[in-house]
């Protein structure tokens, strides 16, 4: 009789624990820009359709999102290999995409963070110009740019070539200064125009600046007819995105190791750029773009996923 009671108690305890796991709310965090809002919406809707309870918080700066995840306030964040390598772990060694991923996976595991498989898209920095202007000047790469600028500055000393960028890149130790030194670019203080990253694209489109710092998966590059210059000396690090999950959450949900693979496998540069364009150019909401992406790839069986908590 006692053995039967003990068995029943153990069974009830198991059911109670399972119920707690099912009732757990997964906290998804995202950063300030369009791409992050889309990725968090995709993740939230994908998880909700599979019976998980989620909340979403977007609009976080990179360091704030990282700190929130390390302290246990966020469970899932889409992170970039370059951000973890350079900003969080202070590694300035030049690594290729695969080596970058292996290094951050190892380093962040010590912080209680688990990197899932990386996507194929690389949202790194790049320099861009209006396509027509770049074609006229014969500029395909950053080295071409350096050559043309040197020729023009020699022919017309004191000439300006306005360069638009966000304030962070202008001041960060792996930003404007080291890049200019590597390529032999010479910009004066009067050449530099600091502005919100989103305004750089409009300034380029309207020919208000000669050159701009952009992100390679931004949807406005194609629509605004901007040429991304080849980083032929490989200055910019790789920024491949991947879901990063707290280790405690992974221990409770080992299925997460492969659950997101259908999403990860479908995200490349062209796909991410097209998704971003639907928000930035077509003015669709990140939630709608996410739902359409999931439906297109048959990752929602009836298209009735929730919209992913508070934005």
Swiss-Prot record:
Residues 1-23 form the signal peptide. The keyword Signal applies. It is found in: Periplasm. Its main location: periplasm. Keywords: Periplasm, Signal, Transport. InterPro entries: ABC_Gly_betaine_transp_sub-bd. It comes from the Bacteria. GO terms for molecular function: carnitine transmembrane transporter activity. One of its GO terms (biological process) is amino-acid betaine transport. SUPFAM superfamilies: Periplasmic binding protein-like II. The keyword Methyltransferase does not apply. One of its GO terms (cellular component) is ATP-binding cassette (ABC) transporter complex. PANTHER family: IRON-UTILIZATION PERIPLASMIC PROTEIN, THIAMINE-BINDING PERIPLASMIC PROTEIN-RELATED. Binds glycine-betaine. Belongs to the OsmX family. This is Glycine-betaine-binding protein. The lineage of its organism: Bacteria, Pseudomonadati, Pseudomonadota, Gammaproteobacteria, Pseudomonadales.
């Amino acid at each position: 009789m006692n053995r039967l009671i003990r068995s029943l108690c153990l069974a009830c305890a198991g059911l109670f624990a399972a119920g707690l796991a099912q009732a757990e709310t997964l906290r998804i965090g995202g950063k300030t820009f369009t791409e992050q809002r889309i990725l968090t919406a995709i993740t939230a809707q994908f998880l909700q359709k599979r019976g998980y309870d989620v909340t979403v918080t977007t609009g976080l700066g990179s360091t704030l999102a990282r700190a929130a995840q390390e302290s246990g306030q966020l469970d899932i964040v889409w992170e970039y290999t370059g951000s973890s390598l350079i900003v969080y772990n202070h590694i300035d060694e030049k690594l290729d995409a695969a080596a970058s991923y292996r290094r951050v996976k190892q380093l962040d595991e010590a912080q209680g963070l688990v990197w899932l498989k990386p996507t194929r898209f690389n949202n790194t920095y790049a320099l861009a110009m209006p396509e027509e202007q770049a074609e006229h000047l014969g500029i395909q790469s950053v080295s071409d740019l350096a050559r043309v600028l040197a020729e023009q500055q020699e022919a017309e000393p004191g000439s300006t070539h306005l360069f638009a960028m966000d304030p962070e890149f202008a001041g960060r130790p792996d930003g404007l200064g080291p890049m200019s030194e590597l390529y032999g670019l010479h910009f004066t203080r009067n050449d530099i125009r600091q502005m919100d990253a989103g305004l750089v694209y409009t300034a380029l489109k309207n020919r208000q600046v000669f050159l701009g710092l952009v992100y390679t998966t931004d949807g406005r590059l194609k629509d605004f007819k901007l040429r991304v210059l080849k980083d032929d000396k490989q200055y910019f690090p790789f920024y491949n995105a991947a879901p990063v999950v707290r280790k405690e959450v992974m221990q409770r949900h080992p299925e997460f190791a492969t659950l997101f693979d259908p999403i990860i496998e479908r995200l490349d540069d062209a796909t991410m750029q097209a998704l971003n364009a639907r928000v930035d150019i077509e003015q669709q909401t990140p939630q709608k773009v996410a739902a359409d992406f999931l439906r297109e790839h048959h990752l929602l069986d009836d298209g009735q996923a929730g919209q992913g908590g508070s934005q």
